[in-house]
């Protein structure tokens, strides 16, 4: 069945791409195709080979996380499934159009229509960062040998004014909770390795109580907790910490993650398999726009999120466009 779209939660503010994205230049030399691993006993040689790839260099975040060391040890994502729920994805982009790149049961359309090109841009960019093809063209993702299980949902957009969600016993979140629990359960039932959630409600987790969060999202918490599984077998859920720093001039407190990213701070059964991700610049310092780990420091990681080059959905036959985005989604 086509999943029922959730009632427009406010996503993390989508960044604006740099002007007029252009197709990536053809690299000067051919490299091993997607899925190929250089078999060698020489770790340094393998690491150097990956680092010399034009695709590796184009995605500047790879060097910061030392991805080449993982690749040289054979950790390329093979055998894993990454789950992404976003407003749409361009499955025909050259970074995502591999024969088995998207699972056949991915949900690429809404219940009533297909996503527009604009609606597919954020999810396309995020997906290619995670697992874009290593095919001697453009850039490649962190786990380039992984598969993608994608769910398209309608999302609202963050406005110029920061608007913290009202979450307490006076607000009925039953419909939202029903939808989110159903959607997140698709990932759990699929046995997805890790799920990226680049959306959520604005508002510092410090401003909410455990009681209010449990009252609003009981079914979603139950699904995310996966109480019937050992910790090592659970699907991991990674949430954008939020871009509250971009609203600092409005007096916004971005010292801790927003609602979804901060869930494990308040909900103990989510601490083994849920975490927030903050953004750092390429020099390793935290990005000015990013929420901080704060009270959720024990359930929080950092990743490059400033000016990250990745796939860009475009209404053009080439499907080979790229752009830079910034944000904790990246």
Place the predicted regions along the sequence by residue.
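Ser/Thr/Gly/Pro-rich low-complexity, disordered linker/stalk segments of secreted
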Residues: 1-36, 40
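Structural signal for conserved beta-strand scaffold positions within catalytic alpha/beta enzyme cores
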Residues: 102-104, 150-152, 239, 276-278, ...
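Glycine-centered loop/turn positions within well-structured domains
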Residues: 137, 246, 306
